[in-house]
Amino acid sequence: MRKNVRYIALTALVISAFVLSGCDMFRKTNDGKVDLKWYMGLTYEDDNGKDVNYTTKSGDSVVAVALEDKYSEQYGIMKDADVFVSIDMVKDNIDPRFYYDKSNGSLMFTNATTSYEMPLNENVIDKGKVNYTTCIKENKKCYINIETVKKFVDINYKLTKAEGDAPAILSITYKSGKKNIMTTDSNIEMRTKGDYQNLIVKEISKGTKVTVIESGKNWDKVRTENGYIGYIPVSELNDSGTQEVSFKNDDDTYTHVTLDTKVSLAWNQIYNQNANNNFDELTANVKGVNVISPTWFSLVDKNGNLSSLADLNYVEKAHKKGMQVWALVNDFTDRKLTKKVLTSTALRKKFINNIMYFADSYELDGVNIDFEYITEEIIDDYLQFLRELSIECRAAKKVLSVDNYAPSKWSAYYDRKQQIKLVDYLIIMNYDEHTSASDEAGSVSSMSYAQN
């Protein structure tokens, strides 16, 4: 009896040891393979809850797009030998400076000094010929040739052709930094999640190099050079070292016109031409202000024209007092005008030319853009306006400042991170905590409100 007890105890001990060591003897393994089109974002769920493959109206093949650490939710398009990717995918993940003008059907890319225009379905960039079609339209959306993206942004890409059940994959890399490279120790199955019970993505051959996306205790999320993303056991990976990856950017070309000291700015509300005559009286006892912004210009019609209350004598007086003049430009006339002008490249150009004409004619040091009718629908158009205006201000050495609402969830779409790259000064209008429309009386801008 004691001998039997010893055998039972020994057996239990051995089993425990196997379990604790993760022995394959007790591992439940799923031999099923995932639907790669579904896994890579090439399907959608119809009204009946059924997964349906995406197709194009033109009959061209769809392509999975593998980004640095995930698959894009927006498919690419294979057209002849070219691959086109969604402009939204490019803007959200690679570079936000691509812009599609629906009014004239052209793609634009704008950097610190130049705005390039590319008509749909043509091999033209700013009237110069290239050996590929720069962009196409599919399902009312603009798709950009990956070669067009590469022309303006430093990226690497690799196209893996469709084979069997596996779709074609466009693998794109574009992020600089240290990459942890591993090599597979044997032939191993990549899975959808870090567990043997999850479906197989692909059989990965021994000696395959992979980039680690997420490190885990037992499984690493990795990416192969040809765009397969999934999980591999840590025990099957050998460390191949760290690779420093560097993609070029043009951040240093975005020069700024700034003051050598802190800006102390005051706005001067000008309702009519005669109000300019009050400058001496209004500033008689003012100290510390080094910038004044008279509210002189308004967008007044659908052709991009401005109304003006500007006064050269006012500018001369301000300069004598050591003040720069950044005249304010607003869109308070009509929200429909704002949308009409900003959504057209031709009208934006006229509008910007008018702004720069007045800035030059009245010897302004800068302009202050104060637009209140920027909805989420036209934010891309507004940002494109700032890109184009910044080119002109940069060239003319005029300060470009822009007014923004206080940061909040509802105004997050204003994309201040992108704005600050374009403009010289981003001004937060940190008030309106309580207004005449509020349910209760209170501070216009309390300390806690301003700090938040």
Predicted feature descriptions by range:
Residues 3-28:
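Sec-dependent N-terminal signal peptides of Gram-positive bacterial secreted proteins and lipoproteins
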Residues 22-216, 246-254, 258:
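Primary recognition of N-terminal secretory signal peptides and signal-anchoring hydrophobic helices
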Residues 187-189, 228, 233-280:
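Boundary/entry segment of secreted carbohydrate-active catalytic domains
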Residues 207, 220-224, 232:
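SH3/SH3-like beta-barrel fold
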Residues 264-268, 290-294, 325-329, 367-369, ...:
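Hydrophobic faces of well-ordered beta-strands that scaffold small-molecule active sites
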Residues 277-300, 355-367:
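Catalytic domains of carbohydrate-active enzymes, especially glycoside hydrolases
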Residues 302, 306, 353, 376-452:
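Substrate-binding surface in catalytic domains of secreted glycosidases
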Residues 316-367, 371-374:
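Substrate-binding cleft of extracellular glycoside hydrolase catalytic domains
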